[in-house]
Amino acid sequence: MGQDKALLEFHGKPQIEYIHDLLQKYCDKVFLSKRSDQGPFKGLACIDDAPEFSDHGPLGGILSAMKKYPKADWLVIACDLPFISDETIKTLFTLRDPQKTATAYISTQDALPEPLCAIWEAHAYGSVLKLFKEGMHCPRKILINSHTRLIDQKDP
């Protein structure tokens, strides 16, 4: 595409600002996960990928956040979901199972977990890290191979 998806404009503002504003209602603090060669993003708190997780895409960002704040549960939302709504986030929290590794929506395209529209629980860091060290670097595969609460999407 040649352009940072976080900066694409939807809803009259860059997508990253829309997501940030949406998540502020649900989170004590909102972070943007990014590679060390990206940004800075003015006015947004960022977590750079830790060196051991760099070059591992979204999973690198998830693990970096979990490592930096090990007691925090993580609402993970991709920056390229222009149709995500308040209702989407509210439903995720309402149907959340904190005993699981994560709570995630089921993709309407392939019936697999959506790891970038999910709540990843703090207690799962060790098991997620173990799978990463065993060579599993896809967040979707990690959720498939973990105890994940899967929820249906109301409006695919």
What are these regions (language model features)?
Residues 1-156:
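Nucleotide and nucleotide-moiety/phosphate-recognizing core
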